[in-house]
Structures are given as structure tokens and as C-alpha cells.
From Swiss-Prot:
Location relative to the cell: Cytoplasm
Keyword Hydrolase (UniProt): no
Function: Required for maturation of urease via the functional incorporation of the urease nickel metallocenter.
Gene name of the encoded protein: ureD
Protein name: Urease accessory protein UreD
Organism of this sequence: Haloarcula marismortui (strain ATCC 43049 / DSM 3752 / JCM 8966 / VKM B-1809)
GO molecular function: nickel cation binding
A Pfam family annotated for this UniProt entry: UreD
Length: 299
């Protein structure tokens, strides 16, 4: 959980007191639980529990696949603040199909002490599918953000998991002024560990615009297409062909242990990276579910 012992890179921050509202105070520990099950009418949200800052307004008939269900996570707050600890748990039952996103970008606010953390756990039952495609994360100046996500796939399960990072309020000329960002993704399947991926950026210590990191680009995004029972080499080649036609600098590669494919994209605007990753998502969904991806519009 996000409130547990932090990653070693964040241990020093964890000892810093938060003056306005301590870690663990009401409104600081956000919890969201969603459970989807397959029913006679398709997929149904059978359990939901949310505490501030999370809120959902039911499900939406939004997906091109009739038997799928959609939830957009809402937040009444201005963003993620220092000392916030958020835990999200999404469970998709056997043969169920769910799409979960956020209604708007996650804004990680400027911090003077401590840090913010989010722990997301995704579980997909046998033959089920989950699309977890939130809006971008925007890292304001001096922010410190730890993001951990784990995915567990049952036999025959598939998932698409996406993440886009914007390193500041670009319209203001704010770029790479955050203090630390660490994102870790882990995936397991019926036979155990599939892969682990990490992004750790500390602009004050190492230049993220250096060659081999982000170079001349600003926005960074990744989409993981997790499909252990599919031919990852064939899927990787197909997705690579799709994303290299976009405006972003992008490519696709097969993940270890037959887990699926990772698609990465770099660009100067969030919209450019999102469009490229959406093209990959759309192609993957047609391959996995014989249905296109939903539109990225939320209004």
C-alpha cells in the first residue's frame, strides 16, 4: 500500500512533517476499490468503494464493445498534494471486460516537504480483459511522486496499461523542475513473474534531456499490451508499424517471458504522445477483443 514503508529513494522525504495535514489525516489517504464481474447482460460493476479524493458516478455505456463496462475516476480536489497516499484496487472477474480511466489529468502539486504516493493493484480473471488508460500525470515544480502499479493476470487474461508523464506546466515554460519521479510497473501471470519496468527521474541530479534519456523531447509515455497467450513477436511488429507513422518518436518491443509488448512514445506535447499510444491501443484491442479502443474524449 502507498502508506507502507516507502521506496528507499523516498525514505528521507517520509520523515518530513506535513504542516497543513499530516500523512494519514482525513482526506490524505485516498482509497478506491472497483470490482467488475461478467453477468448475463455483459460486464457489471458489482462493487465500488471510494474515499476522498476519489469519486465515481456509476458506469458509462461508452465502449464500442457492447459487453464491456466503463468507469471514469473523478476527483473534486485540485490535484495530488504533499503527504497524500492513494491506493487503487481494480478487479476484473472471469470473462469480464472493463475500461477504467480518469476524467482529467493528475496534477502533482508543488511540495516543500514529504512526498506523494500512489499504489495501484490490477487483477484480471481468466479470459477477462482490462484497459487501464488514465489521463496524463503532470509533475509541477518541486514535486516528489512515487507511483507503483502491479498487474496480475489469470490464464487467458489480457490487459492494456498506459501511462503518460508531463514534466511540468509546459504552457508556462515549466519543464523538468520537479524534484523526483519514480514509477514502477510489475506484472505476474499464472506461472509467476512476467516483467518489471521502472522510470526514475531526478532532474536536479541527472539531466533528463541527455541523450539516451529523453533527448530533445519533453513528454514520455508507455503502453503495455499484456497478452501472455498471444504471439508477442507478431504483435510487437504490428504495433511498431502502427506507432512509427505518428508524430511522436515511438517504437514497440516484446516484453520478457512472453508477457506481451511495450510501446514507448516521446513528444513535445501530451496530445501527440497520447494520439500515438491510442493508435497502439486501438490496434491491440482489435487483435485481442475484435473491437476498437474507445475514443479518448471525456467531454
Amino acid at each position: 500500500m502507498a502508506a507502507d514503508a516507502p521506496h528507499p529513494a523516498f525514505e528521507g522525504y517520509a520523515t518530513e512533517a506535513v504542516p497543513q495535514a499530516a500523512v494519514g489525516s482525513p482526506g490524505k489517504d485516498g482509497v478506491l476499490e472497483l470490482t467488475f464481474e461478467r453477468t448475463a447482460d455483459g460486464t457489471t460493476l458489482v462493487h465500488d468503494y471510494a474515499t476522498v479524493p476519489f469519486h465515481i458516478s456509476g458506469t458509462l455505456g461508452y465502449d464500442p464493445l457492447p459487453e464491456a463496462d466503463t468507469v471514469f475516476i473523478q476527483s473534486p480536489t485540485g490535484g495530488v498534494a504533499q503527504g497524500d497516499r492513494h491506493d487503487v484496487s481494480i478487479t476484473v472477474g472471469d470473462e469480464a471486460v472493463a475500461h477504467v480511466s480518469t476524467q482529467s489529468s493528475t496534477k502533482v502539486q508543488t511540495m516543500t516537504c514529504n512526498y506523494a504516493a500512489a499504489d495501484t493493484t490490477l487483477s484480471v480473471g481468466a479470459g477477462g480483459h482490462l484497459d487501464y488508460v488514465p489521463e496524463p500525470t503532470i509533475l509541477h515544480a518541486d514535486s516528489r511522486y512515487l507511483q507503483e502499479l502491479s498487474v496480475d493476470l489469470a490464464p487467458g487474461a489480457t490487459a492494456v496499461v498506459s501511462d503518460v508523464v508531463v514534466p511540468g506546466r509546459l504552457a508556462r515554460g515549466e519543464r523538468f523542475e520537479f524534484e523526483r519521479y519514480l514509477s514502477r510497473v510489475r506484472a505476474t501471470g499464472p506461472d509467476g513473474h512476467l516483467f518489471e519496468d521502472a522510470t526514475h527521474l531526478t532532474p536536479g541530479d541527472e539531466d533528463p534531456t541527455a541523450p539516451g534519456v529523453l533527448g530533445e523531447f519533453t513528454v514520455y509515455g508507455t503502453t503495455f499490451v499484456l497478452a501472455p497467450d498471444h504471439d508477442e513477436a507478431e504483435l510487437s511488429d504490428a504495433l511498431h508499424a502502427v506507432v512509427t507513422d505518428g508524430d511522436a518518436r515511438a517504437g514497440a518491443t516484446a516484453l520478457p517471458n512472453g508477457a506481451g509488448v511495450a510501446v514507448r512514445a516521446l513528444g513535445d506535447r501530451a496530445e501527440t504522445v497520447q494520439a500515438t499510444l491510442h493508435a497502439a491501443w486501438d490496434h491491440a484491442r482489435i487483435e485481442l477483443l475484435d473491437a476498437p479502443a474507445p475514443s479518448g474524449r471525456k467531454y
